[in-house]
Amino acid sequence: MRILLSNDDGIHAPGIQTLAKALREFAEVQVVAPDRNRSGASNSLTLESSLRTFTFENGDIAVQMGTPTDCVYLGVNALMRPRPDIVVSGINAGPNLGDDVIYSGTVAAAMEGRHLGFPALAVSLNGYQHYDTAAAVTCTILRALSREPLRTGRILNINVPDLPLDQIKGIRVTRCGNRHPADQVIPQKDPRGNTLYWIGPPGDKRDAGPGTDFAAVDEGYVSVTPLHVDLTAHQAHEVVSDWLERVGVDGQW
């Protein structure tokens, strides 16, 4: 199995280093990751400037100022030959649950892999300690995928409780919950008296009931949420069509 491995915490982050070491026990791994923390970069792609890469002695490649999406795009289209069998993103420091997937660079890297035609996993740890647990879970899932590929064009968003491996209760397939909208902005003054703003933490859980990714992780289970790239709200087609006909917008400009 050939794996393109990226993340959004940066190439030196403990999550990606732990996962790369574990994956190399049974797979060919090419790391292509940002040279610094790009958390919250979502699906941003660098278009107005060039991208420079640096290759370490072990073959890992850092993309200077690159986003997670940049890294996967370059990895698939230029840096990994032959191309990968699968794209893996993580292990993220902290969860990507519910609305987090909108902003997450970890999920975005996997989404770019899927967009380019490859199976993709995004892996996050609900904390900052037991990266070895998340790595073991990821390796188990990847070994299973190598034996029997998943017949669905979906991204698997995997969130792992921050627990020792022997305390993980199992795996649940979940849906995304959601949070209350975040509204905290923290102002500060720089030495010249200008105002700086920091975006505050995410909102509290709102929909975290049974079946959600929040609930699974809180109860000690690995959460696996299938995601897809198509953002079309297919069930809303008829509602929107009826509304447009009713209000008479068509042809009124």
Swiss-Prot record:
<dbReference type="GO" id="GO:0008253">
    <property type="term" value="F:5'-nucleotidase activity"/>
</dbReference>
<protein>
    <recommendedName>
        <fullName>5'/3'-nucleotidase SurE</fullName>
        <ecNumber>3.1.3.5</ecNumber>
        <ecNumber>3.1.3.6</ecNumber>
        <ecNumber>3.6.1.11</ecNumber>
    </recommendedName>
</protein>
<dbReference type="GO" id="GO:0004309">
    <property type="term" value="F:exopolyphosphatase activity"/>
</dbReference>
<dbReference type="InterPro" id="IPR036523">
    <property type="entry name" value="SurE-like_sf"/>
</dbReference>
<comment type="function">
    <text>Nucleotidase with a broad substrate specificity as it can dephosphorylate various ribo- and deoxyribonucleoside 5'-monophosphates and ribonucleoside 3'-monophosphates with highest affinity to 3'-AMP. Also hydrolyzes polyphosphate (exopolyphosphatase activity) with the preference for short-chain-length substrates (P20-25). Might be involved in the regulation of dNTP and NTP pools, and in the turnover of 3'-mononucleotides produced by numerous intracellular RNases (T1, T2, and F) during the degradation of various RNAs.</text>
</comment>
<feature type="binding site">
    <location>
        <position position="9"/>
    </location>
    <ligand>
        <name>a divalent metal cation</name>
    </ligand>
</feature>
<dbReference type="GO" id="GO:0005737">
    <property type="term" value="C:cytoplasm"/>
</dbReference>
<keyword id="KW-0547">Nucleotide-binding</keyword>
<dbReference type="GO" id="GO:0008254">
    <property type="term" value="F:3'-nucleotidase activity"/>
</dbReference>
<keyword id="KW-0479">Metal-binding</keyword>
<keyword id="KW-0963">Cytoplasm</keyword>
<dbReference type="GO" id="GO:0000166">
    <property type="term" value="F:nucleotide binding"/>
</dbReference>
<dbReference type="Pfam" id="PF01975">
    <property type="entry name" value="SurE"/>
</dbReference>
<dbReference type="GO" id="GO:0046872">
    <property type="term" value="F:metal ion binding"/>
</dbReference>
<dbReference type="InterPro" id="IPR002828">
    <property type="entry name" value="SurE-like_Pase/nucleotidase"/>
</dbReference>
<feature type="binding site">
    <location>
        <position position="8"/>
    </location>
    <ligand>
        <name>a divalent metal cation</name>
    </ligand>
</feature>
<comment type="similarity">
    <text>Belongs to the SurE nucleotidase family.</text>
</comment>
<dbReference type="InterPro" id="IPR030048">
    <property type="entry name" value="SurE"/>
</dbReference>
<feature type="binding site">
    <location>
        <position position="92"/>
    </location>
    <ligand>
        <name>a divalent metal cation</name>
    </ligand>
</feature>
<feature type="binding site">
    <location>
        <position position="39"/>
    </location>
    <ligand>
        <name>a divalent metal cation</name>
    </ligand>
</feature>
<keyword id="KW-0378">Hydrolase</keyword>
